[in-house]
């Protein structure tokens, strides 16, 4: 795996995180909502944890424990990256057949109501599902969505 693909995974993860609809109806079906919340939390909190782990050892003149504190700091700093990497990989994963059917049904419902969409994908990925779900929640009324949720 090259650096370019890892970097692309991080970028895809950010895009997927921004695209995925954070709806309670989807929380029981997909793990994305938990990963997104954990990644956002880690992005806010883990840099402070990293700094505190190193500074606390320095403040108490415990330089012997500084290597362990640095290890904890590095681990804390990689936690948001782990979430972004997982989300990036997930966004490029092809949907299983049952979800692909669901994707097509929702896509057809949106287009049948007259809303413009990108062309239907033959091998949809989770990113396309996120886009379709996002559009469905924004443009369809609750009665149209009752069939799926």
UniProtKB/Swiss-Prot annotation:
Subcellular location: Cell inner membrane
InterPro entries named among the record's database cross-references: UPF0208
Keyword Cell membrane: yes
GO cellular component: plasma membrane
Topological type in the membrane: Multi-pass membrane protein
Alphabetical UniProt keywords: Cell inner membrane, Cell membrane, Membrane, Transmembrane, Transmembrane helix
Protein name: UPF0208 membrane protein PBPRA2797
């Amino acid at each position: 795996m090259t650096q370019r693909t890892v970097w692309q995974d991080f970028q895809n993860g950010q895009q997927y995180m921004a695209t995925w609809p954070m709806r309670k109806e989807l929380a029981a079906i997909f793990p994305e909502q938990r990963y997104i919340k954990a990644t956002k939390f880690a992005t806010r909190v883990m840099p402070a944890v990293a700094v505190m782990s190193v500074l606390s050892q320095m403040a108490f003149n415990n330089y012997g424990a500084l290597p362990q504190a640095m290890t904890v700091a590095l681990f804390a700093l990689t936690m948001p990256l782990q979430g972004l990497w997982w989300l990036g990989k997930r966004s490029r994963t092809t949907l299983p057949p049952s979800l692909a059917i669901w994707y097509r049904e929702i896509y057809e419902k949106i287009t049948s109501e007259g809303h413009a969409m990108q062309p239907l994908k033959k091998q949809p990925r989770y990113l396309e599902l996120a886009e379709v779900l996002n559009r469905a929640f924004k443009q369809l009324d609750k009665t149209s969505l009752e069939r799926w949720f």
